[in-house]
Amino acid sequence: MAFLDQVEQAGVDIATDKWNLLCLGIFEDKELSNQQQQFDKVFSGRISEILAEDDFRGESGQTEFVHPGQGIPVKRLLLVGLGKREKFTIDKARHAGGTAAREAQKRRLAEFAVELFGKTALNESTGEIGQAVAEGLVLGSYQFTEYKTDRKSVV
């Protein structure tokens, strides 16, 4: 059995914190939250460029990896589609956490940061949203490896 075994709450200072991966949730309307707009400025408009293209539509479960470029301490950015803003629920925040965990696991990234997915669309407390996202991270990273003969190390 293998899974993500540690989730910590931490503020992210994009200008100084070094992360292998930062995960942001994007709705189908592609409207960035205030925090995401700040991230976009640090990334020199790279998030807006990706959203202007039609490849990433923000559909639930859709993902897009972005390499932000030189001079930015975050190595990779993962956009996670959240679906329609008006239909977003706390369970979909949990699902987005699972999607982020699986994508990080595929790339063997042990440490990564996620935002509170869909915080602007939910009436829940920050604690409830954080719990749902953390549950999604843990459940999404779960792998049953008991009977596998070729066990890969799991992030």
Residue ranges and their predicted role:
Residues 1-155:
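Glycine-/small-residue-enriched capping loops at alpha/beta junctions
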